[in-house]
Amino acid sequence: LYMAVKAKMGLKPWNEWDEEIRMRRPEALKKWRAQCAEDISYYIFVQYLFFEQWGKLKKYANKKGVKIIGDAPIYVAMDSADVWARPELFQLDENNVPTEVAGCPPDAFSEDGQLWGNPLYRWDEMAKDGFSWWLKRLKANLTLVDVLRIDHFRGLESYYAIPYGDATAKNGR
């Protein structure tokens, strides 16, 4: 559904979509599912082809003794199906706008710090169901690769929060 709506919206980020679908109102979801049924089938088919082909490639590589290493970023993009589908898992306000975003503090490498702009997780919310979103994410990644590296793993034990809308990372904490 996400990609079908995104295509119909001219590839605009989901947080710029019409309010009803941006906020995932049940009546809007139903309407868009019906309106985009053919496109949804297309995206399902394309994903099926990818996973079939990737599975064959991985099997061939493994048979030849080659292990595939994957790299999963600690944070997901704001403009992603993950954030749109599960906004309660991210530090967003009542309008689904980030309150704080990810980055790194200023240091010798960068006097302004690094402003990545990804929405931060609501770990307290994720803990309520045993971090099932994370477990599903890792499990899905591990079906594609033999070894998975989490990029900026340190983000699991601490993070740097920057007020949303800031031009640099200087005001983070």
Question: PLM features: what roles do these ranges have?
Answer:
Residues L1-F51, V76-R173:
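Alpha-amylase-like alpha-glycosidases and glucanotransferases acting on alpha-linked glucans and related
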Residues Y43, Y48-V76:
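Conserved, well-ordered alpha-helix/loop/beta-strand core segments that scaffold catalytic motifs
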